[in-house]
């Protein structure tokens, strides 16, 4: 007998999610008995017992535990089950970790009159051996965080689609491995649902706010028991990326021929209107990478969002435009979405003829498959 699919609030090992109420669930597999007779949930913090239900008739779909949670704390838990046939098994150890309670960081921004999207950076040099490190972050409209240029986590489109006038969710990332050495934390912002247009209106007016904003706080716990907190403030620097246009409907435009922009100090900005909270939305991740096997025809229509891989050869200054043309044979058009441009543009920046090879770029492109063919390779879906 085995106990599998252990979840808290239907999430496997959730990090930084809102936990006003904790609901535990599990599945018993390969049991000889016909039903679960009784179960016991044990919750620990750092090896000490925080809650113990004892053996009782617990609901395997929605069991609750009397537990007062502390912020920034990891709770380990197991569930033991007995069946009517006298079998007994204990699950593997699972966990959930609570979010931040007090923010020392400030909301920061930049000159919003410039179209090139901002990249905020901070040099971090841990002074001792790191035991654990967490990044608590929210960037508006959208953000992607990187450590020494490498993406942190596997999520996209954070902080997702919600009513920013009412609430704004921040995300938590385990950055222990990254902060074992000195490096640069960088955060690139896009327009997203907050700052970009929202709906079929062609006008590029912001829906919730018109300014890029960033709030980030790094907590470092050292092996000697000390802690260090690094938050966004005026000491952070801001430069510009090669992306000068982005939209959840229209994709993005990137020009790698643009000159580098010297970093300047970030500026303090007002907090957004909505209440900041732990995350509720589950991660948006790449679910599949599919090779081309056949051309599909979907009379009913379907919609995909994803990255279009572009292998390109060209000369400096030439532009590649990958577009889904509307309402033409063999192309894609989704009725009712006529305001969606559905194109991605990239400017070459490093090749001159003859070109010995090609490089692949991933362009964010909302791909709409209507009543027609699907002529290009599908690599990832969100």
Spell out what each predicted region is.
Residues 1-382:
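Extracellular/oxidizing-compartment recognition motifs
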């Amino acid at each position: 007998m085995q106990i599998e699919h252990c979840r808290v609030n239907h999430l496997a090992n959730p990090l930084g999610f809102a936990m006003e109420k904790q609901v535990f669930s599990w599945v018993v597999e390969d049991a000889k008995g016909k039903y679960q007779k009784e179960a016991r949930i044990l919750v620990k913090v750092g090896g000490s017992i925080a809650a113990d239900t004892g053996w009782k008739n617990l609901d395997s779909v929605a069991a609750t535990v009397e537990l007062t949670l502390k912020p920034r704390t990891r709770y380990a838990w197991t569930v033991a089950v007995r069946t009517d046939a006298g079998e007994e098994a204990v699950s593997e150890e699972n966990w959930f970790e609570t979010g931040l309670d007090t923010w020392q960081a400030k909301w920061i921004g930049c000159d919003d009159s410039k179209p090139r999207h901002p990249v905020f950076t901070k040099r971090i040099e841990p002074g001792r051996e790191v035991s654990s490190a967490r990044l608590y972050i929210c960037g508006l409209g959208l953000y992607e965080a990187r450590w020494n240029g490498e993406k942190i986590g596997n999520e996209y489109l954070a902080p997702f689609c919600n009513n920013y006038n009412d609430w704004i969710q921040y995300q938590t990332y385990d950055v222990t491995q990254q902060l074992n050495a000195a490096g640069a934390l960088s955060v690139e912002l896009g327009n997203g649902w907050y700052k970009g247009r929202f709906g079929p209106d062609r006008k590029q007016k912001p829906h919730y706010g018109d300014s890029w904003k960033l709030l980030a706080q790094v907590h470092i716990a050292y092996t000697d028991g000390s802690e260090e907190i690094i938050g966004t403030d005026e000491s952070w620097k801001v430069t510009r990326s090669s992306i000068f246009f982005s939209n959840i409907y229209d994709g993005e435009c990137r020009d790698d021929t643009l000159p580098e922009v010297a970093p300047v100090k970030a500026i303090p900005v007002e907090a957004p209107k909505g209440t900041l909270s732990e995350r509720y939305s589950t991660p948006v991740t790449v679910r599949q990478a599919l090779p081309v096997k056949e051309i599909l025809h979907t009379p009913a229509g379907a919609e995909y969002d994803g990255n279009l891989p572009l292998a390109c050869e060209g000369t400096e200054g030439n532009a590649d435009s990958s577009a889904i043309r509307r309402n033409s044979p063999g192309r894609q058009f989704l009725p009712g979405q006529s305001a969606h441009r559905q194109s991605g543009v990239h400017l070459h920046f490093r090749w001159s003829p003859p070109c010995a090879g090609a490089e692949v770029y991933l362009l964010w492109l909302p791909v709409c498959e209507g009543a027609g063919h699907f002529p290009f390779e599908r690599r990832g879906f969100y």
